[in-house]
Regions:
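Short coil-to-beta transitions that initiate beta-strands within beta-rich domains
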Residues: 32-54, 82-99, 126-198, 225-239, ...
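Conserved beta-propeller blade signature
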Residues: 57-60, 103-105, 201-204, 243-246, ...
Length: 518
């Protein structure tokens, strides 16, 4: 705390404005520079628009989430193909697999793309869209001659009226010819889009429940949700093997809070109005500890008790200054809550929201929270504040700099270095030269920041901004590199991966790979 205070004092003495503020963008061929696994996006893929079978995979085209892939022989879901993989659009209209040339084609509103399996990248097709894969004509002829058509030939595409009576598990009810009733009595539909594989399985499309699998041996229907809910992601929280994803609803169903149980590869959705205790599922922030996961929403703080499997919501009735939550930070046994009208905290495990007796921040929007061993640093609409929990004291950092005094969007601490980013630029303290440095020409809208060895990362409205501290070098990653969207809201560091909550989906960027640099 004393070191940071001293650094702020030095800032008042003199601010060094760095001259090196040129931001580099992609200048190389992305398909020779990146591998297909360097950028992977998980977007809403509940509405299936096309189904095709290749040599090793069954492919599901989707309305918003690119192409889902299931390995037919090893029985696992591989990462999806999206614009991060080179597709020109995540809206897939049709799929076709050319078995002779081993090429997968995808028709999108922007044209027909083809996947090169040898070099593992997508490119515009030169000769248009070939017809979908079909059975041998003799197999179809033989099938239609049979009185008891119990087995479809491989690659056959049956209509709904050709399907047998189907059985489902306890969670769903199937009502012929195409209605699927979910556990909350919502009606979805089985589409007349599907293809049979070599193992007597029929892979089909639904209009909101993701891929469907019909085992034609016992006539059982299995629903297989394989994506985030229908949201614009705003936050990602890595909870051991579980991955929690929240955001704002895009108006489609299902929506809500998403849990990806990575060890079992199961996706679940938790929606307000359907799950008791969840008042709102438009999520802006997520944090947690070993027992609880907290979700900042547009209508208070939602808490999930993993031990009891219970949900509850905290609102102004529990003394929140505002129900519009901007950020959450678990520090020790407390949850600190940045709201649109100040800061609150909650003693984890209890139900009473606390607020400071120091009212300097009341009615001031708090955007982000950072902390060291004793102080909280708060990015607000009116500059930088700090809060001392021991003294219950709030103070404003009057730096005298335009960089710090208006609309700060992100704040961070890394190895005794204090960083701020706002409408008027970025500033940090340089320990080597014992002075503050600012980058006032970088005028982005900042939402978040994160740190990895040698790099500082900024979530902005123009992409993912990287600063190489050692080289004094800036690089801006955009959709041309592999982002799902240039609107990046949150950065979560996972070793050599960055989990990025963007408007177009959650993009996982492998920021470090030996031999790769931008």
């Amino acid at each position: 705390m004393q070191k940071i205070s001293f650094l702020l004092f030095l800032f008042l003495i003199g601010l060094s404005n760095s001259k090196a503020q040129v931001i580099q963008k992609i200048y190389f061929d992305r398909f020779t520079h990146y591998t297909i696994e360097d950028w992977v996006t998980y977007a809403p893929a509940t509405d299936i628009t096309a189904v095709e079978i290749g040599d090793d995979y069954v492919y599901f085209g989707t309305r918003l989430g690119g192409i889902l892939r299931y390995h037919l022989y090893d029985d696992y879901w591989d990462f999806p193909f999206t614009t991060s993989s080179g597709l020109r659009s995540n809206h897939i209209l049709a799929l076709s697999y050319d078995a002779d040339n081993r090429q997968l084609y995808a028709k999108t509103p922007k044209g027909v793309d083809v996947y090169n399996f040898a070099f593992q990248y997508w490119q515009p097709a030169q000769n248009g869209m070939p017809p979908p894969r079909q059975p041998d004509p003799e197999e179809i002829k033989y099938y239609r001659q049979q009185k008891n058509r119990a087995r479809f030939p491989a690659y056959y595409r049956p209509s709904l009226r050709e399907l047998p009576d189907l059985f489902t598990d306890r969670a769903y009810l199937f009502r012929p010819p195409d209605e699927i009733i979910d556990p909350y009595n919502r009606i979805f539909h089985l589409k007349s889009i599907g293809v049979v594989d070599k193992f007597n399985r029929l892979w089909m499309a639904t209009d909101g429940l993701g891929p469907a699998l019909i085992n034609l041996t016992d006539n059982t229907l299995h629903l297989m949700p394989r994506s985030i809910a229908n949201i614009f992601p705003k936050a990602v929280y890595l909870d051991d093997s579980d991955i929690w994803i929240g955001g704002l609803s895009n108006g489609l169903t299902p929506s809500g809070i998403c849990l990806w149980q990575n060890d079992t590869d199961i996706w679940k959705y938790y929606e307000a109005g359907l799950i008791m205790g969840i008042a709102n599922h438009d999520v802006t922030a997520i944090d947690g500890d070993r027992r609880f996961v907290f979700f900042g929403t547009e209508l208070g703080v939602v808490r999930y008790d993993k031990k009891k499997d219970e949900w509850s919501t905290f609102t102004r009735a529990q003394r929140l200054l505002s129900e519009q939550i901007n950020d959450l930070r678990v520090i020790g046994n407390k949850l600190y809550i940045a709201t649109e009208r100040g800061i609150n905290w909650l003693d984890i495990g209890f139900k009473n929201i606390q607020r400071s007796k120091d009212t300097k921040l009341n009615s001031i929007p708090v955007r982000k929270i950072a902390f060291d061993d004793s102080l909280l640093y708060l990015a607000t609409a009116y500059g930088i504040y700090r809060y001392d929990p021991r003294l219950d004291k709030i103070s404003v950092l009057k730096t005298g700099s335009a960089v710090f005094d208006v609309n700060i969007g992100a704040v961070g601490l890394h190895r005794d270095t204090l960083w701020f980013a706002g409408d008027n630029g970025i500033a940090f303290y340089d320990p080597a030269h014992k002075q503050w440095r600012s980058f006032t020409q970088i005028r982005f809208r900042f939402h978040d920041m994160a740190f990895t060895p040698h790099f500082v990362w900024f979530a902005t409205d123009r992409g993912l901004l990287k600063y190489d501290v050692n080289e004094n070098y800036w690089y801006l990653y955009t959709t041309n590199d592999g982002l799902a969207s240039n609107h990046v809201y949150r950065i979560t560091v996972d070793d050599t991966d960055l989990w990025l909550a963007t408007k177009g989906g959650v993009t996982v960027f492998r920021w470090y790979r030996p031999g790769k640099s931008e």
